[in-house]
Amino acid sequence: MPADDDDASYLLCAEDAGAAVFDVAVDISTCTTEDDECCSVGGEELYSAASIAELIGGEAEYSPRSDYPDRLRSRSIDPAARAESVSWILKVQEYNGFLPLTAYLAVNYMDRFLSLRHLPEGQGWAMQLLAVACLSLAAKMEETLVPSLLDLQVECSRYVFEPRTICRMEFLILTALNWRLRSVTPFTFIDFFACKHISNAMVQNANSDIQFLDHCPSSMAAAAVLCATGETPSLAFVNPELAVNWCIGLAEEGISSCYQLMQQLVIGNVQRSAAAAAAVNLFSDEGLSYDSSSPPPPKRRKRSPPGT
């Protein structure tokens, strides 16, 4: 922690410390955007195409200012300090078992704040305090169990801040971001983009095979998503064992069986269809084509039967 509270005097605000804590604890949970649909859901809600389009239209409101990346590249904002803060956030996320969305939101709050406000230069504790406060706010938004502000700093190596100091920083962040914490994130779109096209097509193809009648809809949906992610090398680690944790009630055996069947029948049929189409194109483009400028092949003379 900084040696003297005066070092953090820029964090002081007119409100009583208790009021600041109350604001953080109560108002964050009730704050809403102007449009209730513009919120992060972490994959728990389904959106229509119109809702997704509306979210895309409003996502810039939850992003840093447009000049922020250039300020990082030009080092007017220290990119190394930002990278260190992001690394710390990811370590604490893993240590506490937080959702990936929580870490993403913390970095989002930090970037948005840095694009709007200036931290004291040469004060390493200020950047770390910002990271702690942003992660605290993100955890309050998304996590069921939130560690105490002291426990949240278990991975901090240089400074440990008092709860009241963190709460003051939280209040500054909330003010700078206009209390807009329900950010639109990549997690908002993943379900829609991934399932709408690839997974839906797989379920549709599977519908024609009677072997899938042995499987419940939830297993088919999980298997379709697994097949879709299997086509992406970076997502090859996703498997039925992980899929069973997506929702209470899913059975690993059912998902695994349906997944194997879908790989054999649906993906196999698609590959065979593609191969057949390629073969047809090959014959039509090469085997059955000839140069119209060249003379036609000579006709064979019909041989007469002997004795004629």
Curated annotation (Swiss-Prot):
One of its GO terms (biological process) is G1/S transition of mitotic cell cycle. The keyword Cell division applies. It holds the Pfam family Cyclin_N. The keyword Cell division applies. One of its GO terms (cellular component) is cyclin-dependent protein kinase holoenzyme complex. It comes from the Eukaryota. Residues 298-308 have a biased composition (Basic residues). Keywords: Cell cycle, Cell division, Cyclin. GO terms for molecular function: cyclin-dependent protein serine/threonine kinase regulator activity. Residues 286-308 are annotated as: Disordered. This is Cyclin-D2-1. PROSITE patterns: CYCLINS. InterPro entries: Cyclin, Cyclin-like_dom, Cyclin-like_sf, Cyclin_C-dom, Cyclin_N, Cyclins_cyclin-box. Belongs to the cyclin family. Cyclin D subfamily. CDD domains: CYCLIN_AtCycD-like_rpt1 (cd20543), CYCLIN_AtCycD-like_rpt2 (cd20544).
